[in-house]
């Protein structure tokens, strides 16, 4: 359903955000 799609997208975005923040921390 729509809820699952939303969760899937949220996970993808969260991963991108985390890796982005992690890279900024490393610099």
Swiss-Prot record:
It is found in: Secreted. The keyword Secreted applies. Keywords: Amidation, Secreted, Toxin. One of its GO terms (molecular function) is toxin activity. Pfam families: Cu (PF17563). InterPro entries: Cupiennin (IPR035164). The modification Glutamic acid 1-amide is found at residue 27. Its main location: secreted. GO terms for cellular component: extracellular region. Expressed by the venom gland. GO terms for biological process: defense response to bacterium. Belongs to the cationic peptide 04 (cupiennin) family. 08 subfamily. This is Cupiennin-4a. It comes from Cupiennius salei.
